[in-house]
């Protein structure tokens, strides 16, 4: 299923691959608008269940029930009515949740490019969810990173569907409470 390009050139061993180099510009707002093969200095988190840091922020009132599409009295692990997308910084000492407006400033990408990244995240997560369900798993949330490749098309430059990048729950255990 073709969702977007990647920087993968070839798998050259069972545990190695060759990828195309992308330029990394760490200075906020300094990426030229016409540059190709450039890393987008943002991390996109897609949440499907209320857990982890989102749960803690919800408890502190930093995220609202309305934002998340849940009831005020929901519990940890509640399935969200629709995926909840968040953007965090990439080159700060600690990842920091930011607004879409700040994301556009930091990355100097266009709103159209950011929306295309969001679209790709949702498509990748739908694929992960389908495959995980076949194996008795629930895909709770995950994070992804991107670059802009030829013609500034969105390119996935991160692993996904791994224990490092995604959170998983056992579907049977979840169903049993």
Describe every region a protein language model picked out.
Residues 144-177:
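Catalytic activation segment of kinase domains across protein kinase-like and atypical kinase folds
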Residues 1-89:
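Active-site loop/lid in soluble adenylation, ligation, and acyl-transfer enzymes
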């Amino acid at each position: 299923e073709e969702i977007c390009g990647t920087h993968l050139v070839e798998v050259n061993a069972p545990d190695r691959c060759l990828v195309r180099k992308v330029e990394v510009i760490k200075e906020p707002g300094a990426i030229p608008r016409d540059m190709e093969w450039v890393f987008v200095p943002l991390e996109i988190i897609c949440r499907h269940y209320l857990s982890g840091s989102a749960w803690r922020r919800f408890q502190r009132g930093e995220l609202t029930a309305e934002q998340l599409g849940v009831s005020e009295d929901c519990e940890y692990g509640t399935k969200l009515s629709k995926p909840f997308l968040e953007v965090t910084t990439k080159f700060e000492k600690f990842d920091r949740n930011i607004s879409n407006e700040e994301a556009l400033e930091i990355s100097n990408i266009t709103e159209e490019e950011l929306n295309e990244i969001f679209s790709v995240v949702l498509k990748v997560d739908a694929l992960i969810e389908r495959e995980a369900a076949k194996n008795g798993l629930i895909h709770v949330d995950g994070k992804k990173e991107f670059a802009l490749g030829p013609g500034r098309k969105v390119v996935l430059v991160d692993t996904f569907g791994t224990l490092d990048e995604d959170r998983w729950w056992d579907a049977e255990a979840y169903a049993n409470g």
